[in-house]
């Protein structure tokens, strides 16, 4: 919980002849101490002053919102609890290396008999910090170097430069983060970036240079993100053997898009949850603010988790999405959906389901995927705790489909097309949870419903990532 120091109302001498207390008085002293303890726990108190010590470049008015709740405490237990909650809020701001709390009796001419002073002793982060770490994406690893200027203007602002080098993607970017005073979850971010990625399943390479702005707005139980992105995209062939369909997509495009994301997440963990649910809905509209990409895109994710006996967890998930071109121009290969691989429909190659040309997968305009999973602790564990708690056995059933749509037809024809030629798979394996960062899966898969052109992985398949079906 951190350190909360509560100084006593009086200084009590220790027992012993040399310390001025006779052993005959010990019973009286014990009775006095019990009385004092009862007074501390049950008597009404008033928090008269809340002080913050150790501030350098941080503005005091910015922190006032985080500590104001301490003044509402009415007894010592509430003071300690609300002080701890305020300490957690101060640490959450990301501008302090350490925060300690000291609770003491009020002193001075205006001190009340039951008055308390609460002092937060803070240690600010350095003006310039650096970091080095590794990240795991969807079946991809990367090394990340970062330079950060925390609390740049004294009210929680943050300027970050980050360079990432991965197995399929290299990027660097500069971002500025500004939270709202008193409401850290409500914040504004501006990003400048360049990303170069390789997509071997499509024989495609893509370089994006762009700018984006994001506004995060928590509302009741939901988190909302409003975003505008302007990006200059350069598409090219990854190999000389790239199909004509991919070569036809090569060149430069400009994309200007507005998007909105709503998230409801009650899971106890994002990596390997035991309970709770997730609902994520994302809409993207491109073309109305400029650029030559014109489409409306919708993407939905739903996940339910329920814990059963012996620590087993049953999980069900459903993904779905559709992209609708606005105007006569077809959608770009960079904007379509992709399906298949160890993080979605297991037993198939990475993004190797659906429309393709000469072995290059072109993505689809509509898709759905569902999964049913049973996670259990490792059998024959000698005791709880330790390394074994990071592992789970995994039984799964996955299904899905992806296709292009004829928008001249009605919704019934679209649903019928998505219900045809369903790919599905089942299998079992082992999962390793890497803290709250990522998870690794090693599964033995049995792909079924394989269609012509699909790339399968019949047998052992390894997956690493954050988002799994």
UniProtKB/Swiss-Prot annotation:
It is found in: Mitochondrion outer membrane. It is a multi-pass membrane protein. Keywords: Membrane, Mitochondrion, Mitochondrion outer membrane, Transmembrane, Transmembrane beta strand. It comes from the Eukaryota. It holds the Pfam family Omp85. One of its GO terms (cellular component) is mitochondrial outer membrane. Associates with the mitochondrial contact site and cristae organizing system (MICOS) complex (also known as MINOS or MitOS complex). PANTHER family: SORTING AND ASSEMBLY MACHINERY COMPONENT 50 HOMOLOG, SORTING AND ASSEMBLY MACHINERY SAMM50 PROTEIN FAMILY MEMBER. Its C-terminal part seems to contain many membrane-spanning sided beta-sheets, that have the potential to adopt a transmembrane beta-barrel type structure. This is Sorting and assembly machinery component 50 homolog B.
């Amino acid at each position: 919980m951190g350190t909360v120091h509560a100084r006593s109302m009086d200084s009590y001498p220790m027992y012993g002849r040399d310390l001025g207390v006779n052993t005959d008085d010990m019973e009286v002293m014990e009775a006095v101490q019990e009385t004092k303890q009862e007074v501390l726990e049950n008597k009404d108190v008033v928090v008269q002053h809340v002080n913050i010590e150790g501030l350098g470049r941080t503005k005091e008015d910015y922190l006032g919102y985080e500590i104001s709740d301490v003044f509402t405490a009415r007894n010592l237990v509430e003071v300690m609890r609300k002080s701890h909650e305020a300490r957690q809020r101060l640490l959450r701001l990301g501008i302090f290396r350490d925060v300690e709390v000291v609770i003491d009796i009020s002193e001075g001419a205006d001190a009340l008999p039951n008055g308390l002073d609460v002092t937060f002793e803070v240690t600010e982060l350095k003006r310039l910090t650096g970091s080095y770490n590794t990240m795991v994406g969807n079946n991809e690893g990367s090394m990340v170097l970062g330079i950060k200027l925390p609390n740049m203007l004294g009210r929680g602002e943050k300027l970050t430069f980050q360079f990432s080098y991965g197995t399929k993607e290299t990027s660097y970017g500069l971002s500025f983060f500004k939270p709202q005073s008193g409401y850290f979850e409500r914040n504004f971010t501006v990003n400048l970036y360049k990303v170069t990625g390789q997509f071997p399943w499509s024989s495609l390479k893509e370089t994006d240079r762009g700018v984006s702005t994001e506004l995060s707005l928590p509302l009741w139980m939901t988190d909302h993100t409003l975003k505008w992105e302007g990006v200059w995209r350069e598409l090219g062939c990854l190999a000389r053997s790239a199909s004509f369909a991919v070569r036809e997509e090569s060149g430069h495009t400009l994309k200007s898009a507005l998007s909105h994301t709503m998230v409801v997440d009650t899971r106890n963990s994002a990596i390997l949850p035991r309970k709770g649910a997730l609902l994520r809905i994302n809409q993207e509209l491109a073309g109305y603010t400029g650029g030559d990409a014109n489409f409306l895109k919708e993407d939905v994710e739903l996940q339910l988790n329920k814990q059963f006996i012996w620590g087993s967890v049953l999980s069900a998930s459903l993904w779905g999405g559709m992209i609708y071109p606005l105007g006569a121009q077809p959608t770009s290969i960079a904007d379509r959906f992709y399906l298949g691989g160890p993080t979605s429909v297991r037993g198939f190659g990475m993004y190797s389901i659906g429309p393709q040309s000469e072995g290059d997968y072109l993505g689809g305009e509509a898709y759905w995927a569902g999964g049913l999973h049973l996670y259990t602790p490792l059998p024959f564990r000698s005791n709880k705790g330790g390394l074994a708690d990071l592992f789970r056995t995994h039984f799964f059933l996955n299904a899905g489909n992806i296709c292009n749509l004829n928008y001249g037809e009605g919704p019934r024809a679209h649903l019928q097309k998505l219900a045809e030629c369903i790919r599905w798979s089942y299998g079992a394996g082992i999962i390793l949870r890497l803290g709250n960062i990522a998870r690794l899966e090693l599964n033995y898969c049995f792909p079924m419903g394989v269609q012509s052109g699909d790339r399968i992985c019949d047998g052992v398949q390894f997956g690493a990532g954050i988002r799994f079906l």
